[in-house]
Amino acid sequence: MAQATREYGEWPLKRLMTEVVGSGHKSADDMSRTQAREAFRRILGDEPDHTTLGAFWLANRWKRNTPEELAAYVDVMAEESVETATPEADPVDCGANYDGKGRSAILGVGAGVVAAAAGTPVVVHSGDRVPTQKQDAYKHVLDELDVRTEIEPSESADMIDEVGFGFYYQPAFNPGIDALFERRDNMGVRTFVNTVETLANPANASVHLGSFYHLAFAKKMVRTLVQSETSNVERALFFQGMEGYDDVRPGETVVAEWPVTGEESDDEDIADFEIRTGEYGMDIESEDLQVDDIAGESAAITEAVLAGEREDGFADAVALNAALRIYAREDADSIQEGLEQAREAIADGSAAETLDDLRAF
């Protein structure tokens, strides 16, 4: 313990449990930035025993992390685990949940490629069967499309610059988080790691795109980005997504963007507004996007939509999700203008050509 104290400080996880976070969701205290930083440094350093780590993760889950705590975790992850590789292009960083989807098609590959074909570079990142759900994610759709995924960060950056769309593989760019796989798997529930890994931003992008179930989560993510000392994000767009993924939910859905300009606004304010996806051509229900074989069918849908061979609800959903990426980077003044760019990229064949380039990389 003496060596741990010299190396890390005076807040081992067991002490944080007994004195700060471990008394229950109503009476627990929040950690200071210093305490949260030390906790995550110890976790990434494999210092806590499994029982103490599990208890700490559960205590954080029960009390709910503050933006300051999450920002501290993001900063430690950036300093001690993430290997960034910055492309010349400044892509939209898509932070989808790493543990994947289990009911509906993954549309972000198709949407990202369409956006890239329209001139908006896009970066996505994921692992391989990440706990807790261990379901299909970006990697698995790309694998089905015969796109290289198990590549080094420098190659991922080159992919963005050469193709306009790039994929970063978690074991390659974020090995410290990847090393926690077994412990996370044994937990059986999500932890704060599921949140902070989506903010890893391996391409050092200035624009982040994410999703939420409740608007309060989007506000917390913005405050986390603002309070992070390592984040390069200058603009963020969030929307209500399907299964926690960055595929917009059909119907009436909330979109939130940051920053907000104006004299009355502070650094952490967000602007939120409702859209009806049917007004953008996506006039379907969530059930219409369900598939049985998530990776395989998502890949087949992606290929057909980009080739102009489908004009159904999936095609409309891919186009609108591409539009949101284009709008996020401010390559269009409105979502509608982004949608027009996306549809043109599909119609003129450039989206299919971009997919060919991605496969050839």
Q: What is each model feature region?
A:
Residues 2-15, 31, 86, 162, ...:
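Glycine-rich anion-binding loops and their surrounding alpha/beta cores
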Residues 18, 22, 37-41, 54-58, ...:
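Predominant activation on well-ordered alpha-helical scaffold segments within soluble catalytic domains
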Residues 1-102, 116-118, 122, 129, ...:
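Acidic, glycine/proline-rich low-complexity segments that act as flexible tails and inter-domain linkers
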Residues 56, 143-162, 166-173, 322:
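Contiguous N-terminal and early-domain "leader" segments and peripheral loops that mark the onset or edge
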Residues 90-159:
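A generic, well-ordered mixed alpha/beta core segment in the N-terminal half of proteins
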Residues 9-12, 19, 67-70, 131-151, ...:
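Short, structured segments at the rim of ligand-binding sites
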